[in-house]
From Swiss-Prot:
PROSITE patterns for this protein: KH_TYPE_2 (PS50823), RIBOSOMAL_S3 (PS00548)
General function of this protein: Binds the lower part of the 30S subunit head. Binds mRNA in the 70S ribosome, positioning it for translation.
Protein name from the UniProt record: Small ribosomal subunit protein uS3
Ribosomal protein among keywords: yes
Stored SUPFAM superfamilies: Prokaryotic type KH domain (KH-domain type II), Ribosomal protein S3 C-terminal domain
Assembly description: Part of the 30S ribosomal subunit. Forms a tight complex with proteins S10 and S14.
Cysteines engaged in disulfide bonds, as pairs: none
Keywords: Ribonucleoprotein, Ribosomal protein, RNA-binding, rRNA-binding
Highest rank taxon of the organism: Bacteria
Keyword Cytoplasm listed: no
GO process terms (BP): translation
Length: 226
């Protein structure tokens, strides 16, 4: 039976960057890794309603720089920047180093696999039919320019006695092509019948030379003006 490698792990350093970029001595590595885990856990808990896509952590010159990619930057920043200042103090306390927090807005949340997976999980928790939630997510992604998308949900779908897996795909999702920009994420929906797992793969185009390739617009038809 064929098994699938993790789409993000196999592309690290090729077409996908790391979520933490820092170097450390052998003595400090474990402490830094643990503080990274604590920071991510804290931020995901505090910002669970802020549509956070991913959290990138840098450690320049004995300080910590956290970049939060979110579709709702206003929720993270708060009134006059009060909320982000509280987060900065807490992150500095967790890491034991001066902290800086940057906010990066996700312009198209429909093309971000983590936000799509969280959205589907939220709909399942609100008792929306799983097929409707899946189909809506697929249609939105294709409409906004995705080359392909696959959505998979597994668990006691619709309250069934026996757990099963259902998936829906549209377009191309080439998992073996390393230059393919595949965005993969998972989420969980806590329903009254148990946990339902959600997986999302989004193919956003091919990456050449470290940057996503952009399709040139077709030339407009008409008379040439001299």
């Amino acid at each position: 039976m064929g098994q699938k490698v993790h789409p993000n792990g196999i592309r690290l350093g090729i077409s996908r960057p790391w979520n933490a970029t820092w170097y450390a001595n052998t003595n400090e590595f474990a402490d830094n890794l643990h503080s990274d885990f604590q920071v991510r856990k804290f931020l995901n808990k505090e910002l669970r309603n802020a549509s956070v896509s991913r959290i990138v952590i840098d450690r320049p010159a004995k300080s910590v720089r956290v970049t939060i990619h979110t579709a709702r930057p206003g929720v993270v920043i708060g009134k006059k920047g009060e909320d982000v200042e509280k987060l900065r103090k807490q992150v500095s306390k967790l890491t034991g180093a001066p902290a800086q927090i940057n906010i990066s807005e996700v312009r198209k949340p429909e093309l971000d696999s983590q936000l799509v997976a969280d959205n589907i999980a939220g709909q399942l928790e609100r008792r929306v039919m799983f097929r409707r939630a899946m189909k809506r997510a697929v249609q939105n992604a294709i409409r906004l320019g995705a080359k392909g998308i696959k959505v998979e949900v597994s668990g006691r779908l619709g309250g069934a006695e026996i757990a099963r897996t259902e998936w829906y795909r549209e377009g191309r999702v080439p998992l073996h092509t390393l230059r393919a920009d595949i965005d993969y994420s998972t989420s969980e929906a806590n329903t009254t019948y148990g946990i339902i797992g959600v997986k999302v793969w989004i193919f956003r185009g091919e990456v050449l030379g470290g940057l996503p390739t952009e399709e040139k617009p077709a030339p407009k038809r008409g008379k040439n003006r001299k």
